Curated annotation (Swiss-Prot):
Belongs to the bacterial ribosomal protein bL28 family. InterPro entries: Ribosomal_bL28 (IPR026569), Ribosomal_bL28/bL31-like_sf (IPR034704), Ribosomal_bL28_bact-type (IPR001383), Ribosomal_bL28_sf (IPR037147). It holds the Pfam family Ribosomal_L28. SUPFAM superfamilies: L28p-like (SSF143800). GO terms for cellular component: cytosolic large ribosomal subunit. GO terms for biological process: translation. The keyword Ribonucleoprotein applies. Keywords: Ribonucleoprotein, Ribosomal protein. GO terms for molecular function: structural constituent of ribosome. This is Large ribosomal subunit protein bL28. The gene is rpmB.
C-alpha cells in the first residue's frame, strides 16, 4: 500500500542526509500519516481515512462533509 494521504495526496519526497563532513546519501522524507475515523453526520456513519497532519487541519477548517465532497468530485471516494 502506498504511503499517500487520502485527502491531500502527499507522498514521500526524496532528499539527502548530509553529514558534518558534507557527505550526502539519499533518503526519503515520509509524510506524517495516521489512520483516523471521522463521524459523518449527514450519512450517519464513520469514515476511515489515512490522512496527513496537514489534512487533519484541513478537515478541522473546512469540515469532513466538504472534504468528502471534494474527494468524490475527484473520484477518490
Amino acid at each position: 500500500m502506498a504511503r499517500v494521504c487520502d485527502v491531500t495526496g502527499k507522498g514521500p519526497m526524496v532528499g539527502n542526509n548530509v553529514s558534518h563532513a558534507n557527505n550526502k546519501t539519499k533518503r526519503r522524507f515520509l509524510p506524517n500519516l495516521q489512520y483516523r475515523r471521522f463521524w459523518v453526520e449527514t450519512e450517519n456513519r464513520w469514515v476511515r481515512l489515512r490522512v496527513s497532519s496537514a489534512a487533519l487541519r484541513l478537515i478541522d477548517k473546512n469540515g469532513i462533509d466538504a472534504v468528502l465532497a471534494d474527494l468524490r468530485a475527484r473520484g477518490q471516494a
